[in-house]
Amino acid sequence: MLVLHNSQKLQILYKSLEKSIPESIKVYGAIFNIKDKNPFNMEVLVDAWPDYQIVITRPQKQEMKDDQDHYTNTYHIFTKAPDKLEEVLSYSNVISWEQTLQIQGCQEGLDEAIRKVATSKSVQVDYMKTILFIPELPKKHKTSSNDKMELFEVDDDNKEGNFSNMFLDASHAGLVNEHWAFGKNERSLKYIERCLQDFLGFGVLGPEGQLVSWIVMEQSCELRMGYTVPKYRHQGNMLQIGYHLEKYLSQKEIPFYFHVADNNEKSLQALNNLGFKICPCGWHQWKCTPKKYC
């Protein structure tokens, strides 16, 4: 596998992957952030250049210091040739199978290769599939300003009752972590803090000034960790967040997407109402744990 460092090559790859969305959306979103300051210190691997068939994004080696931190040790994969993936994944310099890690992608065809290689290395695999949503409409042209206050200006015109909107920062990480189904531990707290330092987090404040609904963007441009305090559910808070975020991110030409469990009927309905499109390819995650950590 080749590591792509050249900014021109990364841009060519990025534009090429756009043609394979939604299946390529995970690596596409990660490369967007790699091109833009690369705050998570990630890198891009391809099996060949320019005629690539496999793309993997992963943290640089110095980032993966904790062998049990699967939040940091996350790989995103897209392939045009699933039959070649098993061989590539078996290379020790591609995937650090001795660590607890996550592999994420939007192709069900990744499953066989991941499981075969994991089994050969005595690694336990916990698999999850959810529904992938992407924006229905093409992104608008980029605006001239990069000021987040644009979103506040939109919000000031759309306040309802005693609710208002705000951007999150790292001080909100504890609250987000406490209510994130995949979090609630020290490693996830550090991960969320980092996401909120480097990417967009957005929430709704309730009548008493407390945060009642929120969502956070992560290193592959996915909007995750969405939560609404039970007392304030079914009041349109997440719809409000979704509406303004869609407008803001589209204006900035920042890719974004969501995954939702198939039994989360309220979120499914909300995203449908906002005009997001369900992608048949689905969203897939493989948490891989070496036997020594099971």
Curated annotation (Swiss-Prot):
Tissue specificity field: Expressed at highest levels in salivary gland and trachea. Also detected in thyroid gland, spinal cord, prostate, lung and fetal brain.
Main subcellular localisation: endoplasmic reticulum
Signal peptide interval: none
Keyword presence, Acyltransferase: yes
InterPro entries per the UniProt record, alphabetical: Acyl_CoA_acyltransferase, Glycine_N-acyltransferase, Glycine_N-acyltransferase_C, Glycine_N-acyltransferase_N
Modified residues (N6-acetyllysine): K19
Subcellular location(s) of the protein: Endoplasmic reticulum
Keywords tagged on the record: Acetylation, Acyltransferase, Endoplasmic reticulum, Lipid metabolism, Transferase
GO CC annotations on file: endoplasmic reticulum; mitochondrion
One example of a Gene Ontology biological process annotation: medium-chain fatty acid catabolic process
SUPFAM superfamilies reported in the protein's UniProt record: Acyl-CoA N-acyltransferases (Nat) (SSF55729)
Reaction equations catalysed: an acyl-CoA + glycine = an N-acylglycine + CoA + H(+); (9Z)-hexadecenoyl-CoA + glycine = N-(9Z-hexadecenoyl)-glycine + CoA + H(+); octadecanoyl-CoA + glycine = N-octadecanoylglycine + CoA + H(+); (5Z,8Z,11Z,14Z)-eicosatetraenoyl-CoA + glycine = N-(5Z,8Z,11Z,14Z)-eicosatetraenoyl-glycine + CoA + H(+)
GO MF annotations, alphabetized: glycine N-acyltransferase activity
Its EC number(s): 2.3.1.13
Domain of life: Eukaryota
PANTHER family: GLYCINE N-ACYLTRANSFERASE-LIKE PROTEIN 2, L-COA N-ACYLTRANSFERASE-RELATED
Similarity annotation: Belongs to the glycine N-acyltransferase family.
Functional summary from the UniProt entry: Mitochondrial acyltransferase which transfers the acyl group to the N-terminus of glycine. Conjugates numerous substrates, such as arachidonoyl-CoA and saturated medium and long-chain acyl-CoAs ranging from chain-length C8:0-CoA to C18:0-CoA, to form a variety of N-acylglycines. Shows a preference for monounsaturated fatty acid oleoyl-CoA (C18:1-CoA) as an acyl donor. Does not exhibit any activity toward C22:6-CoA and chenodeoxycholoyl-CoA, nor toward serine or alanine.
Protein name (Swiss-Prot/TrEMBL): Glycine N-acyltransferase-like protein 2
Protein's organism: Homo sapiens
